[in-house]
Amino acid sequence: MQFSLIPFISSFALTVIFLPLFIGFMRMKHEGQVIRDEGPKWHEKKSGTPTMGGVVFMLASVISTLWVLIWQKNLNKTTWILIIAFLGYGIIGFLDDGIKLYFKRNLGLKAWQKLLGQIIIAALIIALAFSDHFAFELYIPFAGMVRNSFLFSLFVLFWLVGFSNAVNLSDGLDGLATGLSIIAYATYAWIAYQEKNWVIVAFTLSVIGGLVGFFIFNHKPAKIFMGDAGSLALGGGLATVSIFLHRPWSLLLIGIVFVLETLSVILQVISFQTTGKRIFKMTPIHHHFEMLGWSEWKVDIVFWIVGLIGSIIYLIIWG
């Protein structure tokens, strides 16, 4: 099978065609983002900006992946696992966004409801992988390759839930999570291409195409936000791709900004609960730099560069 940019082009085209219509629909319905009180005060001017844009690039990515792989006669169980992970986490985010919009508040699903949904999707992925005779083995530093279905399943559960939330935490500035996700998915597209894993190539290129189309409307000043529907889907998709390329640990470098954003929140909570003091002015850490006086564009560019450096380092050493 030959490499093709058709998945990228298809997803990009679908997104740039339908996203303006979606933005117009949301504005007509007066449905927009409710900005949380705990965030930077200058973010309040973003209140009312249409959200849930992730639904558009998510569907564009799924449609493009499916029709291209059907056309190439390469549809297999891995395809469906990727789609289920991407759509499954996206649906959880969609429900979360929908509740926020319906009740005009910044809180959607309760934490336990969202976590339960994420665990169910992860469990489904594990079950499908098991039925597909996927190699349940995990490399553990200093211990080597460990073949243990239970340990591997726990890891997959943690990885999917953890990174879906990590991307979600990073979606706090115009274009930030979109740019970081483009870099991460492009890195995995290259790895999959090198390994001739055409299913993952098609999926990652479709997601990249959707994200590039979405970025046109999401960069500062954003005309639309991706919402939890987009960020949870992107995180779940990244985690699943890393696992099915048998390179799960790669996400620690390729998704280094997502990791740092999450660590900043964890450290802040631990510090405040144990000492009563905060390490950062505000978390996730992109808000800390805003509080230091950095513009959104400066934070975006610096964080994108860090993400790009992480990906390049991984490719140089292990690619």
Curated annotation (Swiss-Prot):
GO terms for molecular function: metal ion binding; phospho-N-acetylmuramoyl-pentapeptide-transferase activity. It is an enzyme of class 2 (transferase). GO terms for biological process: cell division; cell wall organization; peptidoglycan biosynthetic process; regulation of cell shape. Keywords: Cell cycle, Cell division, Cell membrane, Cell shape, Cell wall biogenesis/degradation, Magnesium, Membrane, Metal-binding, Peptidoglycan synthesis, Transferase, Transmembrane, Transmembrane helix. It is found in: Cell membrane. It is a multi-pass membrane protein. The chain crosses the membrane at residues 5-25, 51-71, 79-99, 116-136, 149-169, 172-192, 197-217, 224-244, 252-272, 299-319. Signal peptide: none annotated. Belongs to the glycosyltransferase 4 family. MraY subfamily. This is Phospho-N-acetylmuramoyl-pentapeptide-transferase. It comes from Lactobacillus gasseri (strain ATCC 33323 / DSM 20243 / BCRC 14619 / CIP 102991 / JCM 1131 / KCTC 3163 / NCIMB 11718 / NCTC 13722 / AM63).
